[in-house]
Amino acid sequence: MQRILDDSAKLEKLAGDFQFIEGPIWHPDGFLLFSDIPANIIYKFTSNQQVEVFRRPSGKANGNTLDKENRLITAEHENRRVSRTEKDGKVITLADRYEGKRLNSPNDLVVKSDGSIYFTDPSYGVSKDQEELGFYGVYRLAPDGKLTLLVKDLVLPNGIAFSPDEQKLYVNNSEAGYIAVFDVKPDGTVTNQRLFAELKDAATKGGVPDGLKVDLEGNVYSTGPGGVWILSPDGKLLGRISVPETATNLAWGESDRKTLYITANTSLYRIRLKIAGVRAGK
């Protein structure tokens, strides 16, 4: 862990009293965006450490990321869609249906260097009688708008991230308590699903595999029981960052991408690391 985290590094609480926050993403203009799902707000944490409302209502936004043009890509629970915020502030729908049926409640997403958007679609934001698909998928949205179902056999797919070379796709299977990994084929589809790591620890506080990110050396960071779990590229547990609340998601921040921002139930935290994270949108 000393290669990743200095002994003197301390977790810093930045803000609190939120309802349930998720989906942090660092914008290169120098601020962090994150979602408060039940409050129906996307917040902005500024360089002078102030919290401002970025968007209300947010469509009960959950996960956020950026595309190659630094436009905000959002998974919206309430609107059951993946949206994009244009440069003029207009919010447009990128995907809300698969084969004519409404998506469940898009949860988290990642953008590949070719511009395609990969996202998870569990049921956390809808009731059973609102579901139309009958499964919880992982999808690829191509730059031309074509939506492809990649995986439909995970219990509740959640956090999602690529390895630095984009040859592997990691997906958190939250309720089952593990991270799945897939090989990415040249056409963008995935194959060879297998177990990457289990994140189960009855001795710690609550939490399941939720948010997921990868650093430039291929180490995998996942929220889980007790805080943030850090795993080597081969799935070995390197260590954990303890968080006093249930951690939900995480994002690399600052210009060097060596600050790890962590959303927890009601609070926002950060800690400095030694290795930079993979840049959103590549």
Predicted regions and their residues:
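Beta-propeller domains
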Residues: 29-56
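A short loop-to-beta-strand structural motif that recurs across blades of beta-propeller domains
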Residues: 41-43, 81-83, 136-139, 178-180, ...
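Blade/loop signatures of beta-propeller domains
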Residues: 1-12, 39, 132, 190, ...
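Short, solvent-exposed loop/turn segments at conserved positions within beta-propeller repeat blades
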Residues: 37-38, 77-78, 124-135, 174-177, ...
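Residue-level marker for isolated small/hydroxyl-bearing positions within beta-strands
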Residues: 35, 75, 120, 172, ...
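Beta-rich, blade/repeat-based domains predominating
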Residues: 10, 15-31, 57-76, 80-81, ...
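Beta-propeller fold detector
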Residues: 12-15, 52-57, 92-96, 148-152, ...
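Short loop/turn segments immediately following beta-strands, especially the blade-tip
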Residues: 181-189, 272-280
